[in-house]
């Protein structure tokens, strides 16, 4: 699935088109169509309860009309063992399946203090 980037991933403002590749039921790969950049992402709902309001700026930018058509992912920094990998819950990637657009939505940390920028996956694994 190819997406047009409406609000860039921080530090990668040059990327305008990306492909979303499902790896399994938890992980996806976001691959730039402009260069060799790629990100491994996770379905946050597989780890925890995860809710936030999408600011109206992004709703307008991505022409969001039906939130049921959104897919939410979070970028992870992969480490070995996998449990040591960290998840960025502060800046989710929002994909609008209606019009194949995506944006990185940077959340207000004051409004969402429960979400961290580098939370280890092991914190969410039941022992």
Curated annotation (Swiss-Prot):
SUPFAM superfamilies: BH3618-like. One of its GO terms (cellular component) is cytoplasm. It holds the Pfam family FliW. GO terms for biological process: bacterial-type flagellum assembly; regulation of translation. Keywords: Bacterial flagellum biogenesis, Chaperone, Cytoplasm, Translation regulation. It is found in: Cytoplasm. InterPro entries: Flagellar_assembly_factor_FliW (IPR003775), Flagellar_assmbl_FliW_dom_sf (IPR024046). Its main location: cytoplasm. Gene3D superfamilies: BH3618-like. It comes from the Bacteria. Belongs to the FliW family. Interacts with translational regulator CsrA and flagellin(s). Acts as an anti-CsrA protein, binds CsrA and prevents it from repressing translation of its target genes, one of which is flagellin. Binds to flagellin and participates in the assembly of the flagellum. NCBIfam families: PRK13282.1. This is Flagellar assembly factor FliW. It comes from Campylobacter curvus (strain 525.92).
